[in-house]
Amino acid sequence: MKSSEIRQAFLNYFVQRGHQLVASSSLIPSNDPTLLFTNAGMVQFKDLFLGLETRPYQRAVTAQRCVRAGGKHNDLENVGYTARHHTFFEMLGNFSFGDYFKREAIQYAWEFLTEVLHIPAERLWVTVYKEDLEAEGIWLKEMKVSPERFSRCGEKDNFWSMGDTGPCGPCTEIFYDHGPEVAGGPPGSPDEDGDRYIEIWNLVFMQFNRDREGCLHPLPKPSVDTGMGLERLAAVIQGVHSNYEIDSFQYLIKAIAQLGQDIDLNHTSLKVIADHIRSCSFLIVDGVLPSNEGRGYVLRRIIRRAVRHGNKLGLPSPFFFKLVQPLIDVMGDAYPELINSKAHIERILQQEENQFTRTLEQGLRLLQDHIKNLKGQELSGEVAFKLYDTYGFPIDLTADIIREQGLHIDMEAFNQLMQQQREQSQAASQFTTDYHAVSQLDHQSEFHGYEKESMEAKIIGLLQEGNEVKSLNKGAKGAVILDHTPFYAESGGQVGDKGLLIGKEFSFQVDDTQKVGQAVVHYGEVIKGELTLDLSIHAQVDHIRRDAIRLNHTATHLLHAALKQIVGQHVQQRGSLVDAERARFDFSHFEPLTPQQIQQIEEVVNAQIRANNEVITQVMDIESAKQSGAVALFGEKYSDAVRVLSMGDFSKELCGGTHARRTGDIGLFKIVAEYGIASGIRRVEMVTGRYALAWVNEQLGFMNNLAATLKTTPNSLQEKVSQLLLDNKNQEKMIAKLLSEKAQKSGADILGEIEEIKGINLLIKQLEGMDSQTMRHTMDQLKSRIDSAVIILFTIEQNKMNVIAGVSKNIIGKTPNAAQLVRHLCGKGGGRDDMAQGGGDVPEDLNSKIKEIKEMIEKN
C-alpha cells in the first residue's frame, strides 16, 4: 500500500464507525500560545479535553500535519541522520470526547492493524501502564494478546499528562517487531533502546484530573486521544526499516538526486532535503514566512539547512524551490492547499535561497579556516557567533557541519554572546508605561456599542494611576468603569472610542477605551465636578469619529479580499490599525506592490463601494463560521460564538469591530502608502470617505502648484517634466564634454613638471579653481599618459585643501598607495590602492609634507 492509501484507509475505517472526519488544523496553533507549532493530533482538540469548548460530535478522526523543530520538541539536528526523526510528519488519530473509552479504543486499534492492514499479530507488542489493570484485562482476555508479547511499564513511559495539573491518564502503546536481525529488546527491557521494536500507535486514556497536591480524581467524562505516525506505519506496511525508504520519501529523494550528478541515493543529505521540503512548504502554506524571530526564524533555519546540504551535494543553486512540484505529486491529493499555493511557496523558497547563497560560501570558507587551525576538538563560541551574526548561519547549521568532522561548539561562550546581544537590543528599545496602565480588574461591563452610541449607565469603578479609588475630582486624569457602555474598547486593530460621560453636576471626557479582563475601561479627564461610585451617567460616544472608524474598518475587509484577488491567495492579515483619519493594514507578501497592482486594488475596492452591498453581521459558532467560508485571522483566538461579517459574496470574515451599514457609506477608498515593515510583511496605509476626498484634493493642489511653477497646465505636466529631464541630460553631457576638454588641457599643461625618482614618475601639482569632478577627469587623463606614475593633485580654497592621488597599478607595493599618500598630505581620506581622495585643513608645513612624500618614494 502507498502512504496515501494507508492514510485514506485509516480515515475511512473510523468514519465508518461514527467518527467525524475533521480536517488537519494549521501548523500554527490557534488555541495554545505555549506551542510554537502543532506537534500532535490532539492540539486542535485541547479545549474540548479541558471542557472549555463543545462541538456537535463526540468522536473524531484526523490526519494531522505536525512540525517538530524549535522549542521543546526539536528534532532538527537529528533529521536525516536517523531512521525516524523528521521536522514534518503526519499524525493519524482517533478521538473520543466522553463517548467510548478503553475497550472500544483498543478493539478499534487492534482490528485496524490486524484485519484492515493485515499486520500479523505475532509481529506486534503491547505495553500498558503498570497500574492499569482494566487495559491489561482487555488486551489479554478479550483481544487474546499473548502474554509473551506484552509488558507493563512505569509512569515515565505509559502515563500521559497535559501538565503538572489537569487532565491525565494511563496510555497503552503498540509496537512493531522488525525481527531478530535488528538489534534491540522489547519495551520495558534493558535493551529497549534498540531499533527492533518501534512504537507505531499510542492510545491515551484521559480519566483523571490531577490537583495541585498531585492527587488524582476521576473525570466525569473520560476521553480517548490516540496518535499514530503515518510514516512509521507506512514503513511497516511496505516492509522497510527506515521511514526514508517509504514510497513518498523515495519519490522526493529521487527527484532531488536528478538535480545533481551521480548522487548516491543513500546519501544523508538527500534525506535531509526530502524532509525539509515537506516542513518548509506546509509552514509557508499556513502563513509562516522566513524572518529573524519566532516561527519565521525556525522556517529560515530549516531552509538554510536544506540549502547547505544541497551545496554539499553540488546541486546548482537555486534548487530547493524545484522540489515543490514533486511534493505536490505525492501529497497534493490529500492537501490541495499545496497546489493552490505552489507559486507562492516556490517564490519564497527561491528568494530565501538566493539571499542565503550570497553568504553561504563566505561563511563556509571562514568555518573551514578555523577548523584547520583548531588545536583541540572544540570550535570557539566566538566563531559560531560570528557565523550567526555576520553570515546568517543558524547555530544548529554550524553544529551540523562541525559534527560531521567529529567536533563540537563551545555553546557556553556562544550563549553568553547571544545573551549580550539580546540585552543590548532590549536596552535600545526601552519604553515608558502609560499613565493609565492597569493589569487586572474584577469588574464586568456589558457592551452595547453595536446597537447604540449613547445610553444611561452607572459607575461601578474608578481608577487613578492604575489604582482603584472612590472619587475623581475636576482636572484629575483617570478611568471610569461602567456597568453598561456603548464605548468600543480597542480590539482587533480598531482603536477605542472617545466621547463624554455626562451627569447633572459633572462631565468626564473619554480619550481612550480599553478592555481589562471583563471590564471596559474609559480613560480620560474630569472636566467638570466630581465623579464618585454608583453615580448614574449618560454615556455618549463621539459619533462623528465612530462613523469614520466604521468606514475604515469595513474598508480593511474589502482591501483584504482585494489583495487576495489581485496579489494571491497566500495573502494573510498580519495586523492592522483602524483609526478615524486613516487605517493601516499589514499582510504577508514577499515583495513591494507594483503601481499597477495598487491601481487594480483601488479599482476593485471602489467597485465594491459603488455596488453598495449591505454589510451583514451574523453570530454563529466557530465551526459553522469556518465551514461557511469565513476568513479567520492568522493566529487569532476566537470564542465559541463569533461575529461573521459579509459584504455580498466578495468578503466574509470573522470580526468583532464596528462597521458601516452598507459598503456605499465608505464613499471613496485610496491607498496613500505601501512599504515593508519586516521580512515578508508589507503595510498599506489608506484613507476613506471625507479623508480620502481631502487627500485627493491635496494631491490635486500639489499638481496645480507644480504646473504653475513650470508654466504649464496640469494636463501637460508629464510632458513638461519629461522635456526638462531630457534638457537636463543633454546639458550634463555638454558639461561632461567641457570638463573632459579642460582636463585634457590641464593635463597637457603640467606634463612638463614630472619628476623621475628611481624609475617612478612623480607629479605633485596644485591646481587653481578646479572642482572635484574636473580634478578626477584630469587625474584619469594623466594616468593614461604617464607610465609608472605617482600623481597627487590638490586645490586650496579658504585654507581648506581637496586632494586626489593616483598610483599606476604596475608599481602598487613598490610605493605608498594612493590612500596613504592622501592621508599623509591632508590627514583625512581614503579609497583604493590606485585611486584615493581626501580633504581637510591645509597643513602648516605643506612643503615639508610634499618633501616627505618624495623621500618615502626614494626609500622604496
Swiss-Prot record:
Entries under PROSITE patterns matching the protein: AA_TRNA_LIGASE_II_ALA
Location relative to the cell: Cytoplasm
Enzyme Commission (EC) number: 6.1.1.7
Secretion signal, residue range per the UniProt entry: none
Annotated Zn(2+) binding sites: 553, 557, 655, 659
CDD domains for this protein: AlaRS_core
GO molecular function, one term: alanine-tRNA ligase activity
EC category name: ligase
Keywords: Aminoacyl-tRNA synthetase, ATP-binding, Cytoplasm, Ligase, Metal-binding, Nucleotide-binding, Protein biosynthesis, RNA-binding, tRNA-binding, Zinc
Keyword Nucleotide-binding: yes
UniProt xrefs under HAMAP family: Ala_tRNA_synth_B (MF_00036_B)
PANTHER family per UniProt: ALANINE--TRNA LIGASE, CYTOPLASMIC, ALANYL-TRNA SYNTHETASE
Function, in words: Catalyzes the attachment of alanine to tRNA(Ala) in a two-step reaction: alanine is first activated by ATP to form Ala-AMP and then transferred to the acceptor end of tRNA(Ala). Also edits incorrectly charged Ser-tRNA(Ala) and Gly-tRNA(Ala) via its editing domain.
Protein known as: Alanine--tRNA ligase
Gene name tied to this protein: alaS
